[in-house]
Structure formats: C-alpha cells, structure tokens
C-alpha cells in the first residue's frame, strides 16, 4: 500500500495536480448560473474567451487508462462539466463504444445511443453537469487537431457550445512519465486569427506534418490545469491500486518498444530529407555587397531555414535519448530496490555507479 501511495504522489507531483477543498465552489453546480451563462454566451462574442481547461484528476486518469487501452488505435469519449469564469471545468469523463483506426475514430449510431443513455443516467444519479467536451487519443504523434478533428470540433461549437476538444497521446505519456495532453478550441468560420509567435516546439511525425500545418491556424490551444480534492484521494487510491503493480512490473522500454522504433524511423526520414537540401559547407567566395546584396540575403535565409530544420532534428533526437535514459534509470532503480542480492557493498556500489552515470547522461 505504501508503494502504491508513493507512486500516486509521484504522479500528482509530475502532473502538477492542485489539491483544493471539497467545499470549493468548483464542485457545486448551480443550474440558475448555468442557464444565465448559456443565455449570455460570452464565448460567441470573443473567440478567445476561454483561457484554460480545468480537469479533475479522476477524469484525467479515466481518460488516460482509456487511451492506453486502445493503443495502437485511437479512442474517443465525452467529458461532463461546466463553465466557471473563463475556464471550462471537466468534472468527469466516460468512454464511447466507437471503432477506431490508427489515424481516426468514427462514432456510430450505437455510440450516440450510449451517449444519450449515459447522460440521462447521470442526471438520475445527481450528476447534473452537461456534456461540455470530447476527448480522443493520438497514439505516438502528439496533441493537436487534424483536419477531421477540426471539422468535428467546429460542428460541436456550432451546435452545442461551449465545447472543448482534448487530445491525449498515450505513447508519449508512458515514454515521458507525464500525461501528454492538450485542450483546443476552434475559431469561427471566416475568422482570421491574429499573428502569434510560434508555440513550444512539438515533435510531429513526417507523415503527419502536412495535416498538422494545414489546419494549424483554424484552432488555438488553451492551458490545462489538473485539480483534485481530499475526498478524491480515496477514489484515486482505488483506481491506482488496480494499476500500480503493472506500473512497477512493466518497463516503458519494452511496452513502448514499437513507439520507440517508429520515433527512430521518423527521425531517420527527417534527417535524410534535410540532408538532401543542405548546401555545401565550403566557405563562400567574397562578393561585393552592392552587387550581390540580394543574392547574399537569399543565401542567408536558405541557410537559416536549413539550420532550423537541423535544430528540430537535434531536439527530436535529444528527446528520444532522454526518454530512453529515463527508462534505463527506472529499470536500474527497480533492480536495486526489489532484487535479492548477497550481502556486500561491491554490487551495491556498482549499481550506484550505473545509476549516477545514467542520470548524468539523461
């Protein structure tokens, strides 16, 4: 039990889960306030009205478990919650019986019937929160919205706003040890978003880059915050006790082996593509600035573009190496803690050296 508790605390710290009082207003549902907000619909006047998406820890774990169970296929579910200020608050989530592939997920009539029955049952069980978002997984290729996702979210916002789209990458979650999650809202049709600086770099597989870039200006990302109350700890403990043994007994190096291979293959393709466009490293012949100014400027721009692509390749390779080192560190630590060893300081000192070396590299 103590090991399970430690693992749960580590999960909470890694994902920056905030603990709030169970008497906090976030846990209270006011139907009059909900109707007032729906009537005013401030989000219809300001496309950037929502600034954050707050997700309960229970809903988060349910979504992550669901996403992981579907690998390598995508999964889909709905989220229930409410609007508080400029935030969409997710109180609970439930899976949908849908058929997914490695690149998309399709909701059939059975899923729609299940959705209606579940929401009606929630009302009878004194859970009045409405469906306020949907979630699905991107196994191994990051958190963003594809063209199909953008169309789905646009329809949701058009007919049942407020609505939010959440994407989870279960492969990167296992590999990095932190939930890889993103929350998104789409812009209205014919809306031109203001030019913004590029967000934090995200590694996208070469096969998905075109789809990622084409629709990048049709939606925006909002901050994700995770919260829980002291009353949630017991429920989280029950959920965690069921899965923490698998966490200890499995290694991300083995369970995520296919994902690691796909990452290396993708990195090879990216570097090969960059290599074909890299100019010669031989020093350029000096030319007069007034005659060759425009040509020199063009060469600098091309060189900057090449360096940018190479820098992305370096970031991808560093990410792969760090995640592999973290997996090795975890295996060494579990070996030190749980393996039976003869008395003596030699083996312990040797393992300590291995751990220190791995940590210094990672």
List each language-model region with its residue ranges.
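MPN/JAMM (Mov34/JAB) isopeptidase/deubiquitinase module and associated MPN-bearing subunits/adaptors
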Residues: 1-133, 139-362
């Amino acid at each position: 039990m103590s090991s399970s508790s430690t693992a749960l605390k580590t999960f909470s710290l890694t994902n920056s889960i905030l603990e709030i009082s169970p008497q906090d207003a976030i846990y209270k549902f006011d139907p009059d306030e909900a109707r007032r907000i729906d009537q005013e619909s401030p989000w219809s006047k300001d496309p950037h009205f929502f600034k954050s998406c707050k997700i309960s820890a229970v809903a988060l774990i349910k979504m992550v478990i669901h996403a992981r169970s579907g690998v390598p296929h995508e999964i889909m579910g709905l989220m229930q919650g409410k609007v508080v200020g400029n935030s969409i608050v997710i109180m609970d989530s439930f899976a949908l019986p849908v058929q997914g592939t490695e690149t998309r997920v399709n909701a059939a009539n059975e899923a729609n019937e299940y959705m209606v029955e579940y929401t009606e049952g929630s009302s009878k069980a004194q859970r009045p929160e409405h469906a306020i978002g949907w979630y699905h997984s991107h196994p191994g290729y990051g958190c963003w919205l594809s063209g199909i996702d953008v169309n789905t979210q646009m329809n949701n916002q058009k007919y049942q706003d407020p609505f939010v789209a959440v994407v989870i990458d279960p492969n990167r979650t296992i590999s990095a040890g932190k939930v890889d999650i993103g929350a998104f809202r789409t812009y209205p049709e014919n809306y031109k978003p203001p030019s913004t600086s590029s967000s934090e770099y995200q590694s996208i597989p070469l096969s998905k880059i075109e789809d990622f870039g084409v629709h990048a200006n049709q939606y925006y990302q909002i901050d994700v915050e995770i919260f829980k109350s002291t009353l949630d700890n017991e429920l989280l403990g029950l959920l965690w006790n069921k899965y923490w043994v698998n966490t200890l007994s499995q290694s991300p190096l083995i369970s995520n082996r296919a994902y690691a291979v796909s990452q290396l293959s993708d990195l090879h393709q990216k570097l090969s593509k960059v290599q074909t466009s890299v100019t010669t490293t031989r020093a350029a012949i000096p030319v007069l600035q007034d005659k060759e100014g425009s040509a020199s400027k063009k060469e600098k721009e091309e060189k900057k573009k090449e360096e940018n692509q190479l820098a992305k390749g370096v970031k991808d390779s560093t990410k792969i190496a760090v995640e592999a080192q973290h997996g090795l560190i975890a295996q060494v630590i579990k070996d030190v803690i749980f393996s039976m060893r003869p008395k003596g300081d030699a083996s312990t000192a040797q393992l300590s050296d291995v751990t220190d070396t791995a940590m210094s590299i990672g």
